[in-house]
């Protein structure tokens, strides 16, 4: 057993998990449960009353956090200490949304001035493009932005841009390309005019395979459509640390935006990686996005554990994963603009906490990162919600909804909200056999049939959920929401004593993929790998099965 699972608090939680009453009983015996188990911060309200948790549960979870030195670990992250120990890096995505008055030291120097300088550079660039001052090679203004990246440099900008669609500049359209599948970029290029298209290449090394391949294809298309190599600088900019490679490509050094080692890809949307977002919604709104995240940073850093929204959410998820064998969490967004958030949170959580050894290399003997999945309501109610209600797996759910819609049409939003709240209630209380039987009392079924159908209509309830509300989806509330999930992920990793900021599983896939690519291009069939890999590579080389 590890030190964590040997601890008295862990053992107490394990014993306690077997004695928590059904949530029906918890609500029946405490009419003030919502008031006791809800919290507002940074424009968000968290209702966590529909959880399998009592005051004793929370006390034990907070004790687990304290015993795991969570508060000290939070301070260490904000202070710029080397908490990504395997890569010997600080973790300071929070510095990207700091205020100009702050001082944050990384590797012996204050990084805030450079962050502010980059934001100011972004401001000038955004102004140039959106005002029409930036011209393409034929003198026309830019109408289309193509953001080329992969992982965090793709998913963050795409999902945030999608979420903030009501704030878009109507004169601009943005397209996102990530997959190395040629179909992805080909379908985008079919829509574009090279004279009015601007490409943003986002890669720290300017050598990420998928991103570089897509960028080279974009340049070939641009040149084939009439542009010259000398015109590339008017249509390509980069977010990278490798200035030399970017300038060799044809990008003007003045149009290269920095990346830093202390920002991981899945936390990078707050940096110049967010340039597509800034172009679409303007720098004032982009700064509001940063401000909302900064407010959540301040809350996370300063609120006591018992009143700390990311801490509470992280602990509850850990509670189900480690003591109820919950293998996944579902994120359900009751707002069409937020439909991409489950995929974003999936990358954030699973790439961060999909680890199996502690910081000192000891194999864990407890579950770590759960599978994160989900979708938008009410679509999911006609699909996978069935499994949530009557399936055998326990799947904690997060419901996310703005109280006000950007598109208030008739009763649409009232119906959306009623479905959202109704689902949380149904998951919590379920339906007993007697209730199901009573509903069938006036049906034409026989007594035997009623008994049978009633059994099929039983729902156990006691299925946990959180509900997150905001007044309206704005850049600020979205920033706070994303930062909330970033810190929730940190909380769990800190207690599990794992490194939430490396991704060696991703790196292995890259290495083996490059090796296979070499073998695909070889002059002879492959026979040096395992039988399956040899056969698959050789079938691909033949081009048919």
Curated annotation (Swiss-Prot):
Active-site feature positions:
351, 382, 510
| CDD domains in the cross-refs | SIS_PGI_1, SIS_PGI_2
What's a single GO BP term from this record? gluconeogenesis
Record EC number: 5.3.1.9
Matches recorded under Gene3D superfamilies: 1.10.1390.10, Glucose-6-phosphate isomerase like protein, domain 1
Write the record's keywords in alphabetical order, separated by commas.
Cytoplasm, Gluconeogenesis, Glycolysis, Isomerase
Q: Which GO terms describe its molecular function?
A: carbohydrate derivative binding; glucose-6-phosphate isomerase activity; monosaccharide binding
What is any one of the record's Gene Ontology cellular component terms? Answer: cytosol
* Subcellular location, record wording: Cytoplasm
KW Isomerase (keyword) present: yes
InterPro entries associated with the record: G6P_Isomerase, G6P_Isomerase_C, Phosphoglucose_isomerase_CS, SIS_dom_sf, SIS_PGI_1, SIS_PGI_2
Q: What class of enzyme is it?
A: isomerase
Pathway assigned in UniProt? Carbohydrate biosynthesis; gluconeogenesis; Carbohydrate degradation; glycolysis; D-glyceraldehyde 3-phosphate and glycerone phosphate from D-glucose: step 2/4
- Annotated coiled-coil positions are none
Q: Which domain of life is it from?
A: Bacteria
Give the catalysed reaction(s), semicolon-separated.
alpha-D-glucose 6-phosphate = beta-D-fructose 6-phosphate
Regarding protein family, the annotation reads: Belongs to the GPI family.
Task: Identify the PANTHER family for this entry.
Answer: GLUCOSE-6-PHOSPHATE ISOMERASE (PTHR11469:SF1)
Function of the molecule: Catalyzes the reversible isomerization of glucose-6-phosphate to fructose-6-phosphate.
In Swiss-Prot or TrEMBL terms, this protein is called Glucose-6-phosphate isomerase
Gene name per UniProt: pgi
